[in-house]
């Protein structure tokens, strides 16, 4: 009886799976997009049996070598394709039909809600329009002071370990600095993450970021119901961290809103709320922009604002952390490049290590910018981007079926020898002004591109230039510790740390 019932259920599942995939298979074949063998129900899942997070990149390179830069995928109940083809990437990133994020980002909803990273359609468009002024030139100019002050704190704390022989993992170091920067610029508050790393909010951000990275790579942690079943204590820990972050953000929003309302009630305007106790104008934060904004004449709710502030806390600290750490790693292992950066920094900023930087001075660090761009080419902070195609869509001359999940392989596209000769080599001069225009814009997309490009990329570049130039002014970076082992995740990390040594500079 049970055997017969099982046979009926299995036959039904197989028939359903075949019918569901038949149209996809036909359309992908007609589009010339091939992929590895797909099995009933499980699709390509057997490919992952002998893989780990640190071998996934190599596996994807092998698939590209065998099937080309567009690879059909079927994973359990999902169908779609991966692409490292710059022309296909251009078609996807440029189209209004393909701006919807796929379920790759569902793990972030508990923390970020429906903020700019995840939101779709009209809500995304309206929020993007509201937030864009937060990155106006004048506001960014004010933020440089924060970058400079927090990076100064970072280097002062590093002197204790700068003995020329201690291995330093730069990821947690850069993480606390980036957290201080984004908290002050997004919320207008000092959380002193570098000085008080045990502060509840700091611990909660660190915990949530690490646990989300783990959930991304562990199939049993992908869904909340499997987390409840197999990892109930971890889920409770994550939920506690998210609650702590939400409580802190809500308290800051409430306090700032009350300040704004009081200023208006006293006969002033919204700008009056930006004055401190002695009448000096405070630095405007992203939170201030959101509090002063309206949609259809109505102000944003506290929940609306929290979604965006939390989104910037996540995107604004983890991505720059990865880039700063990998750039330090590469400078330590390429002394000739480090020497050029150091000389440029001395020429532009001078020999006073305590002299503050300005937006103008950072703009003159042209070679350092090339170094950061080349670091982002080799180690993009966001190694993959997920999109969802909800209706039949022509992309790069290929008709792609509806209900397709697309994974854009940024890491692989930026190591494409068709666009980057000697792609594994660290060559910052690829991005020099003399070679401007040689790189196809969609072969290099560390900040994404098109309508859903990174809204804070100028902010990020200024922060990275400020932080790394400060490091180079104070220390010689040394090639100590294990080589990096990049691991596929929402944000690029390394299983071996991102290591270097430091020796104080004397000049």
Swiss-Prot record:
Its EC number is 1.14.-.-. GO terms for molecular function: heme binding; iron ion binding; monooxygenase activity; oxidoreductase activity, acting on paired donors, with incorporation or reduction of molecular oxygen. It is found in: Endoplasmic reticulum membrane; Microsome membrane. Its main location: endoplasmic reticulum. Heme binds at residues 315, 454. It is a peripheral membrane protein. Disulfide bonds: none annotated. Keywords: Endoplasmic reticulum, Heme, Iron, Membrane, Metal-binding, Microsome, Monooxygenase, Oxidoreductase. Its cofactor is heme. It is an enzyme of class 1 (oxidoreductase). Signal peptide: none annotated. It comes from the Eukaryota. InterPro entries: Cyt_P450, Cyt_P450_CS, Cyt_P450_E_grp-I, Cyt_P450_sf, Cytochrome_P450_Monoox. GO terms for cellular component: endoplasmic reticulum membrane. PANTHER family: CYTOCHROME P450 4AE1-RELATED, CYTOCHROME P450 FAMILY 4. May be involved in the metabolism of insect hormones and in the breakdown of synthetic insecticides. Belongs to the cytochrome P450 family. This is Probable cytochrome P450 4d14. It comes from Drosophila melanogaster.
